[in-house]
C-alpha cells in the first residue's frame, strides 16, 4: 500500500505531467515548482480536482533569493511560496512560483481561487515588491504609505533610508534622513566541524 506522500505525488504527476518544473520531498512534505505562466491553471486544478482537493491556502509568503547559496545561485531572484491544505484528504503541499523578471517581479494573484491569499499577497508586495497581477486591492499593509522601498529585499539597507521622529516645534511627526552611522557586520565564524550538529 502506498503512503500518503506517494499517493499525492502520483496524483500530482497524473494531473500535471510535465507542467511542473519539479516535485521534491523534504521533511515529510512535497514541494512543487510551477512556472508563472501555468500558475493560475495549476492552482485552480489543485483546488478543484477531487484527487487533490486543496481547498485551503494556509500561508503565502515572498522570498528573495539574491544571496541564496552565498552567491552560487543563478536562478530567478523572487518567488512566492504557498502552503496548501486539503482537509478532505488530510495532506499538505508547498507550491513555489518564481517571478520571471527580477526588475519587476510579477506573479498572478490567486485571490479568486483562495480568498485567504488577499492579505498575504499584500504583505509579500509590501515587504518584497512582488506584484500580484489581478489582485483586487494591492497596496501596502505593514509599512507606512510614504515608505520608500521594500524592507525584506536583500539589497535594502538595514538602517533604512529615512527615520521618523516627533518634532516638538512643528508638533507633528516628521521624516528625516537616517542619522545612524552604517556599521560593518562581522560574518559568523564556525570553528567546530560539527557546530550545532551540522555536517560540513
Curated annotation (Swiss-Prot):
Which lineage do the record's taxonomy fields give for this organism?
Answer: Bacteria, Pseudomonadati, Pseudomonadota, Betaproteobacteria, Burkholderiales
UniProt function note: NDH-1 shuttles electrons from NADH, via FMN and iron-sulfur (Fe-S) centers, to quinones in the respiratory chain. The immediate electron acceptor for the enzyme in this species is believed to be ubiquinone. Couples the redox reaction to proton translocation (for every two electrons transferred, four hydrogen ions are translocated across the cytoplasmic membrane), and thus conserves the redox energy in a proton gradient.
Q: Which HAMAP family match?
A: NDH1_NuoC
**Originating species:** Paraburkholderia phymatum (strain DSM 17167 / CIP 108236 / LMG 21445 / STM815)
Task: Determine if Protein biosynthesis is one of this entry's keywords.
Answer: no
PANTHER family (UniProt xref): NADH DEHYDROGENASE [UBIQUINONE] IRON-SULFUR PROTEIN 3, MITOCHONDRIAL (PTHR10884:SF14), NADH DEHYDROGENASE UBIQUINONE IRON-SULFUR PROTEIN 3 (PTHR10884)
Reactions listed under catalytic activity: a quinone + NADH + 5 H(+)(in) = a quinol + NAD(+) + 4 H(+)(out)
For this entry, the protein name equals NADH-quinone oxidoreductase subunit C
Q: Which InterPro entries match?
A: NADH_DH_suC (IPR010218), NADH_quin_OxRdtase_su_C/D-like (IPR037232), NADH_UbQ_OxRdtase_30kDa_su (IPR001268), NADH_UbQ_OxRdtase_CS (IPR020396)
Q: Where in the cell is it found?
A: Cell inner membrane
Which keywords does this Swiss-Prot/TrEMBL entry list?
Cell inner membrane, Cell membrane, Membrane, NAD, Quinone, Translocase, Transport, Ubiquinone
- Quote a single Gene Ontology cellular component term: plasma membrane
- Among its keywords, does the record have NAD? yes
Give its E.C. classification number.
Answer: 7.1.1.-
Q: Which Pfam families did the record assign?
A: Complex1_30kDa
Amino acid at each position: 500500500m502506498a503512503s500518503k506522500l506517494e499517493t499525492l505525488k502520483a496524483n500530482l504527476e497524473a494531473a500535471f505531467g510535465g507542467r511542473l518544473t519539479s516535485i521534491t520531498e523534504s521533511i515529510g512534505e512535497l514541494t512543487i515548482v510551477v512556472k508563472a505562466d501555468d500558475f493560475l491553471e495549476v492552482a485552480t486544478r489543485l483546488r478543484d480536482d477531487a484527487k487533490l482537493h486543496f481547498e485551503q491556502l494556509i500561508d503565502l509568503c515572498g522570498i528573495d533569493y539574491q544571496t541564496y547559496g552565498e552567491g552560487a545561485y543563478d536562478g530567478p531572484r523572487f518567488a512566492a511560496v504557498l502552503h496548501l491544505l486539503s482537509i478532505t484528504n488530510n495532506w499538505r503541499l508547498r507550491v513555489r512560483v518564481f517571478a520571471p523578471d527580477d526588475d519587476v517581479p510579477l506573479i498572478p494573484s490567486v485571490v479568486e481561487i483562495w480568498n485567504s491569499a488577499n492579505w498575504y499577497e499584500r504583505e509579500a508586495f509590501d515587504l518584497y515588491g512582488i506584484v500580484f497581477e489581478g489582485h483586487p486591492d494591492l497596496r501596502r499593509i505593514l509599512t507606512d504609505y510614504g515608505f520608500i522601498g521594500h524592507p525584506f529585499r536583500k539589497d535594502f539597507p538595514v538602517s533604512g533610508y529615512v527615520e521618523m521622529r516627533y518634532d516638538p516645534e512643528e508638533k507633528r511627526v516628521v521624516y528625516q534622513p537616517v542619522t545612524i552611522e552604517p556599521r560593518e557586520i562581522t560574518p559568523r565564524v564556525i570553528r567546530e566541524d560539527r557546530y550545532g550538529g551540522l555536517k560540513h
